Regions:
Chain B
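Serine-hydrolase catalytic machinery in alpha/beta-hydrolase-like enzymes
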Residues: 1-56
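Catalytic histidine-centered segment of alpha/beta-hydrolase-like enzymes
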Residues: 32-33, 145-156
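Gly/Ala-rich beta-loop-alpha elbow adjacent to hydrolase catalytic centers
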Residues: 65-73
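Active-site nucleophile loop of the alpha/beta-hydrolase fold
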Residues: 66, 87-96, 115
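Short alpha-helix in the alpha/beta-hydrolase fold that links the catalytic acid
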Residues: 99-100, 108, 121-130
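Short beta-strand/loop motif that positions the catalytic acidic residue
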Residues: 106-107, 111-114, 118
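Acidic catalytic loop of the alpha/beta-hydrolase fold
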Residues: 116-121, 147-148
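Catalytic histidine neighborhood in serine/cysteine hydrolases
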Residues: 132-148
Length: 44, 169
């Protein structure tokens, strides 16, 4: 997806794979955080 | 990093110019570490909240989670005053235990999305779980959808976007 950035977020010794989109100034300081499912839970 | 439900929500937020971050829990995809039965995953979510608040200067944050991500993500709702509510899609209460139901209790706005053919987040038990939660809250039943929402991604994305608009804008 254009405009997104693939990043890693550090959580102590863990590196979390993430994708970030930052909007223009109109929506600055507001955001959503989306938690992926766990594939084992979905049985896939 | 792909899931049809999450990608539908994520892409819809982008199209509407809303900042968003999605992530894989530890041990999933290219995230390092191993699954830790929820304890570490709660910390993973908090680390993402800290990243948005401290490094991206986000002041108002809505949490969205699907399936296992709903149970874990929504259970961090009381972690920060910057989290102003959550949307849980197919919260798997019956598989996750009472701990996550209690952790996700709050007086912040909540939206629960549920398919009426879901056998993992069991539809027949949905209303009992929903009634546990304090107001403000609301729910949306997606007719004919099971846990995977194939073919219903746009409907889910539309609901999640409208929830965002009703809370933040």
């Amino acid at each position: 997806m254009c405009g997104t950035e693939k990043i890693f977020i550090n959580n102590n010794e863990i590196k979390l794979e993430a994708e970030l989109f930052l909007s223009s100034a109109e929506n600055l300081h507001k955001a959503t955080l989306i938690c992926h499912p766990h594939p084992q839970f979905l049985g896939i | 990093m792909y899931n049809n439900v999450v990608s539908g929500i994520f892409n819809n937020f982008i199209q509407n110019n809303i900042s968003c971050l999605r992530f894989n829990f530890r041990g999933v995809g290219n995230s390092t570490g191993n699954h830790s039965n929820g304890t570490g995953e709660l910390n993973d979510t908090k680390a993402c909240v800290d990243f948005l608040v401290n490094e991206q200067n986000i002041e108002k944050l809505l949490i969205y989670g699907y399936s296992y991500g709903a149970a874990i993500g929504c259970s961090t709702v009381n972690y920060s005053k910057n989290i102003i509510g959550y949307c849980a899609i197919s919260f798997p209460w019956d598989f996750m235990g009472l701990e996550y139901k209690k952790l996700s209790q709050c007086e912040k706005p909540k939206l629960f999305i549920q398919g009426n053919r879901d056998r993992l987040a069991i539809y027949e038990n949905f209303k009992t779980h929903y009634d546990f939660y304090l107001d403000p809250k609301r729910y949306k039943i997606i007719n004919e959808a099971d846990h995977f929402y194939l073919g219903f991604e746009q409907e889910v994305a539309k609901e999640t976007y409208e929830f965002y608009r009703s809370i933040i804008e």
